Amino acid sequence: MSYTPGVGGDPAQLAQRISSNIQKITQCSAEIQRTLNQLGTPQDSPELRQQLQQKQQYTNQLAKETDKYIKEFGSLPTTPSDQRQRKIQKDRLVAEFTASLTNFQKVQRQAAEREKEFVARVRASSRVSGGFPEESSKERNLVSWESQTQPQAQLQDEEITEDDLRLIQERESSIRQLEADIMDINEIFKDLGMMIHEQGDVIDSIEANVENAEVHVQQANQQLSRAADYQRKSRKTLCIIIFILVIGVVIIGLIIWGVKG
């Protein structure tokens, strides 16, 4: 499954696609877990192990695709009024994606351990008589044989060794692929960690700007208050001066009137 681009910058549709992928990853992880539980039982078979590998690789591709979608979602432009809501939505998607990845990586590691255990049993059973009862009849036939005459046993021994080597190579190839896929998921975890860190820096910057704006508003209000106080004091002083001048004029007028009288 290859990565397909977003949905024309529509955040709602992109968020829906991310949520859908997260649900698929969770569902696939549960299916992988059920398949792992069948290994070593009568239901075990080479076909079952092949299905397990295909399901694991499909889920790994889903995880890579979702990682790209979340990056795209985080880079979409937004208005100041929608910024907080967009952050809440992205935080929720990242948290859900992280939870689904954690569970998926858990079953990945279980699958790798099961494959390693199987290879070890095949190697051991190729050196001793008899097989291992945990594996299915199809795979058990590759490494077990019945007591026969010495020439027949030697011939069968050679056939089993060749089949065992082929089986070991297949399983070791599967182990290498699983380990590579686990590393891919580790890289996605790093991406998510970086996104959370960068988003935190952006939010801190926004909050700092808001705080600075609030400080500026408070300072402006204080300056306006001081200006109003100064204006009131100036008016009061002017009124007092005018009152004194009026009194002075009246007194001078009375003095002049008294002299003339």
Swiss-Prot record:
Residues 165-227 form the t-SNARE coiled-coil homology domain. The chain crosses the membrane at residues 239-259. Residues 129-150 are annotated as: Disordered. PROSITE patterns: SYNTAXIN, T_SNARE. Gene3D superfamilies: 1.20.5.110, 1.20.58.70. InterPro entries: SNARE, Syntaxin, Syntaxin/epimorphin_CS, Syntaxin_N, T_SNARE_dom. Residues 2-238 are cytoplasmic. It holds the Pfam family Syntaxin_2. GO terms for biological process: intracellular protein transport; organelle assembly; positive regulation of receptor localization to synapse; positive regulation of T cell mediated cytotoxicity; regulation of protein localization to plasma membrane; vesicle docking; vesicle fusion. GO terms for cellular component: azurophil granule; early endosome membrane; endocytic vesicle; endomembrane system; immunological synapse; late endosome; perinuclear region of cytoplasm; recycling endosome. SMART domains: SynN, t_SNARE. One of its GO terms (molecular function) is chloride channel inhibitor activity. PANTHER family: SYNTAXIN, SYNTAXIN-7. This is Syntaxin-7. It comes from Bos taurus (Bovine).
